[in-house]
Structure formats: C-alpha cells, structure tokens
Amino acid sequence: MVLDELISEFDRGLRSLTGISRMSRPVPVPADTPDVELTPAERTHAAGLMRVNHVGEVCAQALYQAQKLTARTASAKAMFEEAAREEEDHLAWTAHRLKELDSRPSLLNPLWYAGALAIGVAAGTLGDKVSLGFMAETERQVESHLEGHMSELPPTDTASRAIVDQMRIDEVKHGKAATDAGGIELPLPARMLMRAASKVMTSTAYYL
C-alpha cells in the first residue's frame, strides 16, 4: 500500500514538472466579456504574473504530496489529497494560460519543487495539527498574493483574471478546511519566514 502511494505521488510529481497535469475542471472563462487584444507590454506582464502563479501551484503539489505522505491520520491524508487534486487544476489552468500568452513556465521549477517537498516533509513530521496549520497559513498567504495579482493584471486580460479569481476562491476553501480540521496558528517568526521565502520565489519566477 505504501509503495503504491509512493508510485502515485511520484507520477503526480513528474506530471507537475513536465506540464501534463490532469484537469478535473474546465479552465475558468470570463462571463460575457469580449476578447480584447493585449498590448505587448500587457502580455509580458500578464505572463510574468501567471508564471509566478504556475510556480505556486508546482510548490503546492510538492507541499501537499509531502504532507499527505507524512500525515498520521486518514482524515488529514484525505484533506491533503483533496487539496492537491484541486491545486492540480490550478496547475493545468495556469500552464494553459501561459501557452495562450506565448510564454513558458519557470526554468527553475525543479528547484522550487524540491524545496517545497522538503518543507512539506518538515511540516508533516511535526504532527497533523502543525501540518494543517502550515496548510492554512500557506493558503492565507496565497489568497493575499492572488488578490494582489487581481489588481496588477491588465483590466482587459479577462482570461487570466477569471483563472486567478477561481484559484482564490479555492484557496480560501482549503485554508478554512485546514483550520476547521484542527490546524493550529503558526508562531509569528514562522509566518514571517514563509512570507520572506515566498517573496524570493515570486520575484525570481516573474522573470525566470
């Protein structure tokens, strides 16, 4: 059983890094909004933001894979699995949008994935309450990050905005579920360290 689980997660990791993630929900589309041609500068900026979002989803896959494998209860494992499935949709959506913008994922995705996997293992070894608390804090920070992107994306880029908005809705749900399941609030130094690490990732992934 453990071997089957490891093989399944290894397969998911490969799909995350190779850009062939499976999509269980269709790509969100704007409601009744005509397509507007973006300027070259707008396309470049939107692509940078969506690349950052794609990296975030690569990291989410690694985090939740590691946390699922180290979880001590069946309920925690199920929660990490459900979140990972929805995050896999986000991964596919952002990859799809990057292609539409004639851009590419981050060249450093293997590095981001490996780092997030290590962090997920560390969080998981501290117990389910800490691991769920880490999930809740991660989702809160991602929610804030996505809200910032909604204000930064060109108003005419309705395709990217529809994707980001649905991602934000899902992140709020994941964070609340983790808290309701008993996740504890992380100490301030841990939350600050998470923000600092996120800033390094987002500022780098925008370009690379």
UniProtKB/Swiss-Prot annotation:
CC cofactor: Fe cation
Broad class of the protein's primary localization: membrane
GO cellular component: plasma membrane
EC code: 1.14.99.60
Top EC class, one word: oxidoreductase
Annotated binding of Fe cation 2, by residue: 87, 139, 171, 174
MF GO annotations: 3-demethoxyubiquinol 3-hydroxylase activity; metal ion binding
Alphabetical list of InterPro entries matching this protein: COQ7_proteobact, Ferritin-like, Ferritin-like_SF, Ubq_synth_Coq7
Catalysis performed (reactions): a 5-methoxy-2-methyl-3-(all-trans-polyprenyl)benzene-1,4-diol + AH2 + O2 = a 3-demethylubiquinol + A + H2O
Similarity comment: Belongs to the COQ7 family.
Protein name in the entry: 3-demethoxyubiquinol 3-hydroxylase
Native organism: Burkholderia cenocepacia (strain HI2424)
Gene: coq7
